[in-house]
């Protein structure tokens, strides 16, 4: 009987730990990888006004949860190469953090998952995240409209698409059409 209990406990421990989440990269390391030609990465903290929150909600059709936003500007001299923003949101019951890179025209340049605390089988694959590249804030940037959903990771894919819509709208309100 003790052996069965011990084996059951060990099996449960292995299963729980195999489904545990992961932190894939340190945030600044991820930003530096995305801007390899940058001579500096400037952090620009923005506190959104109520008017900006309202405008972002209208543009993205997604509720803004945080008013403090930090953008990471990859710069080479005085030239801005692109903009990075981290987004942490709840997928089902646990958080996911990804880094969204936005080009100067307001399009998605890249998306990288930094940390994922749900079971890893719910993690959107990088191949699917790569479908975001070149997307801009419009009605096609929606799950099942311009983006395929992921079987077995529908909530994860929905959370990512909504967060990208929200952050592209934040970018547009803060930096305008051409990142100025």
Regions found by a protein language model. Give the residues of each.
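Positively charged n-region of N-terminal signal peptides that target proteins for export
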Residues: 1-4
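Flexible, solvent-exposed loop/hinge segments and secondary-structure transition points
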Residues: 19-147, 154-158, 162-180
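Bacterial N-terminal signal peptides
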Residues: 7-16
């Amino acid at each position: 009987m003790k052996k069965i209990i011990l084996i059951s406990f060990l099996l449960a421990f292995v299963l729980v730990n195999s489904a545990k989440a992961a932190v894939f990269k340190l945030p600044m390391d991820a930003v530096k990888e995305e801007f390899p030609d940058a001579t500096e990465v400037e952090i620009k903290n923005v506190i959104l006004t109520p008017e900006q929150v309202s405008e972002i909600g209208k543009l993205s059709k997604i509720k803004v949860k945080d008013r403090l936003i930090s953008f990471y500007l990859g710069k080479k001299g005085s030239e801005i190469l692109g903009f990075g923003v981290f987004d942490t949101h709840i997928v089902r019951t646990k958080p996911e953090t990804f880094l969204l890179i936005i080009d100067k025209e307001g399009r998605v340049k890249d998306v990288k998952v930094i940390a994922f605390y749900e079971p890893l089988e719910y993690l959107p694959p990088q191949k699917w995240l790569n479908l975001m590249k070149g997307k801009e804030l419009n009605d096609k940037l929606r799950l099942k409209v311009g983006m395929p959903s992921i079987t077995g990771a529908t909530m994860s894919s929905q959370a990512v698409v909504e967060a990208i819509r929200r952050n592209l709208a934040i970018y547009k309100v803060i930096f305008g059409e051409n990142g100025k």
